[in-house]
A protein has these predicted regions:
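Short, charge-rich amphipathic segments
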Residues: 7-18, 98-103, 180, 212-223
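Acidic, low-complexity/disordered tracts enriched in E/D and polar residues
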Residues: 1-49
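C-terminal functional modules of predominantly eukaryotic multidomain proteins
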Residues: 15, 23-25, 329, 400-408
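Glycine-centered secondary-structure boundary/capping sites
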Residues: 20, 68, 87-89, 205, ...
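Long, charge-rich, low-complexity alpha-helical segments
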Residues: 31-118, 124-125
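Active-site histidine-anchored catalytic micro-motif
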Residues: 109-372, 376-382, 388-397, 406
């Protein structure tokens, strides 16, 4: 990008309904910038021209052709200044800011609780008073227990309040089982990364202190991988998918003398160059890493749990699909989710991938890489669906579905 060819960073651009009609919310999915901007439709179009290849003049011409009116160069430059100050443009200002944040993260002995006080209660007493009644109200099935050496769960990573019932269903079932010594937590790297899997050795801060990581398993995985598992470690800084499970695990065993150590793994998307979906079993570094994970767990004499932190379908305007969101859309998404979950309950990793890929991921299921990794890591015999919900957002005409599954 040059000063005359501005480039917007990769942002979440979410349609929202306001008193002025439909507008667009700009926010940083990496949470490096705390600022959010709401812009009207015409400015959103103008921003789409800021891809590093168009000059300000070319963007101005495209705007005139689209809307039939002139937007002045001064107005465009004022907009670019606001975006740069908000750290939403790919500029040297932003890159320097990012370098400072990465240096700060590397220097910290622990991974800070990025979402405490926002997504969940910051203090231990407040967390317990909120979440213990939720677990008490959950009713784990009488005929399905996680009594094997390697208990496994799928739990959401959606908003912890909106998905509280699903989280509680998963962790109430785990609470009935013998305590694991370690837990592999398979999250989703929502903001990308160069490696298919990203680890960190940093303990996770929670309302109950710092939850230690399992250095033994992490070191074995790092040695077995064909790539640097720490190359994108900074992605862990703000990623919520592992954090939410770490917090709930620490809560579950906070009164025990020892808590399980965790293995935090962020899973990347499975794609070839050109954007085509790729069978992860055919991608050498992915397959070798998962084979190593399976072998490490099998050879470990301790009780090792595996948790996939995964949501299901993402549909509607927020995810690039035209409104309105109808009951038919919800029914089709639910049918697709259930087809995926049938493969999960059978422990069929390849079947899961085939259902996922058959329509080029039309339903934007973000959690498949973590679920697939779980099914490759353990010999699953059967599963039980514990909870399922579709959370709709009327303001954005969108819906995210999630659930919880016990596996053994």
């Amino acid at each position: 990008m040059t000063e005359d060819r501005p480039k917007l960073r990769l942002l979440d651009i979410v349609p929202v309904q306001t008193q002025a009609g439909q507008q667009f919310l700009l926010r940083d999915p990496q949470r490096l910038s705390p600022q959010e901007l709401v812009v009207p439709t015409d400015i959103a179009f103008l921003l789409s021209q800021f891809d590093g290849s168009h000059t300000i003049r070319e963007a101005q011409v495209s705007y005139v052709r689209r809307f039939g009116s002139l937007i002045t160069t001064d107005k465009i430059k004022d907009l670019l200044k606001r975006l740069d100050e908000a750290l939403l443009l790919d500029t040297e200002r932003f890159r320097e800011f990012g370098r400072r944040l990465q240096a700060e993260f590397r220097s910290r002995p622990t991974r800070a609780a990025a979402h405490a006080g926002q997504s969940y209660e910051e203090g231990a007493a407040a967390f317990i008073s909120t979440w213990q009644p939720r677990l008490d109200a959950a009713a784990p099935p009488d005929d399905f227990a996680l009594d094997g050496e390697h208990p496994a769960l799928i739990a959401p990573h959606y908003d912890m309040t909106a998905a509280a019932e699903s989280y509680a269903a998963a962790y109430a079932l785990l609470a009935q089982a013998p305590q694991p010594d370690a837990a592999v937590v398979l999250g989703i790297g929502h903001t990308g990364g160069s490696a298919p899997f990203t680890l960190t050795r940093k303990p996770f801060e929670t309302p109950f202190g710092a939850l230690e990581t399992d250095a033994e398993i992490i070191d074995q995985l790092a040695e077995a991988a064909e790539f640097d598992v720490f190359a994108d470690e900074f992605l862990h800084r703000d990623e919520h998918s592992v954090e939410f499970q770490a917090v709930l695990l620490h809560f579950l065993y906070c009164e025990r003398e020892e808590q399980p150590k965790i293995v935090p793994i962020l899973c990347g998307g499975y794609q070839r160059q050109g954007g085509e979906l790729a069978d992860p079993g055919s991608v050498g570094p992915v397959s070798k890493f998962l084979e190593a994970l399976r072998g490490i767990i099998a050879e470990d004499s301790r009780r090792v749990a595996v948790i996939a932190s995964a949501d299901l379908s993402h549909i509607g305007a927020r995810f690039g699909q035209p409104p309105p969101l109808t009951q038919t859309h919800l029914d089709l998404a639910r049918r697709h989710d259930m087809a995926l979950l049938e493969q999960v309950k059978r422990g069929d990793a390849e079947g899961l991938y085939q259902v996922f890929a058959q329509d080029e991921n039309r339903y934007n299921v973000c959690g498949v890489p973590a679920i697939y990794a779980l099914l490759r890591a353990l010999p699953i015999g059967e599963g039980r669906l514990l909870s399922y919900k579709q959370a709709t957002e009327p303001q954005t005409q969108s819906c995210v579905s999630f659930g919880s599954v016990g596996l053994r």
